[in-house]
């Protein structure tokens, strides 16, 4: 009797098909029964949204965008077209120029978006923080196997100062530094992210102050009262000169907000704290369950403003917000004798 040689494979295929359908059905039921993820922020946020403050905005996003918002409307927008990197630090100067560090370099542009100065990071190096000193100098840190601090003279195109920096791992460039800021005293506060500490350096590179328990230290700011504001992970805290915590914001203080990756935190003149919440820049954001990009918090930890703008306009992830409600001269700083 002639046997159908294909009957066995056919039967196996049929059984396999039933198994796949069954598994798919179970997966669908499981997905249906799985509880929905909690909202990343309240449906209605406190404050006036985009109209709460005038501000300059930039974030670590794939599209590398920056915005100026006034009166609740975007009045200026810029897209870095280099096609690589992320904007980790940016400052709007009093003359309208914008300085920004974008991982693979530092660039200064005019209000009409012309490049006034640029420095490209060498191969295998990264730059995530930069700050203007006056209108003619820039201080920045270059991550790499030989990490260094630089002060560049824009007019001459030369480096006026170069200083080696200590890191936890010279073979892991990306995680070494994210943020550093000059103080009124002319020292340089550096968040050593890969060493979980904050160090204050003078112009010679000498350590004048340090805090060693700053886990995932992302940003740092010296406050008018002499204390220091530190942010990183899901935590923001203010420490005194002895390193003691005198104020702290944790995830437990924000049960209605999914704040797990805080980047720059800034103490405002009114005493409130502005906290930027980063969202994965290579992912997509569901507008119906979108997190707040930034929140303003009172000293007693009440949220008085929440910014959520993922559509019309889509500001993208938030790393830095510079409020523009009052005139300021952010470039009015110095590093020791360098002014």
Predicted regions: what is each one?
Residues 12-22:
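Bacterial N-terminal signal peptides
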Residues 25-26:
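Sec/Tat signal peptide C-region and signal peptidase I cleavage site
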Residues 2, 20-22, 42, 91:
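A general, composition-driven signal for non-globular sequence regions
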Residues 2-14:
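Bacterial N-terminal signal peptides that target proteins for export
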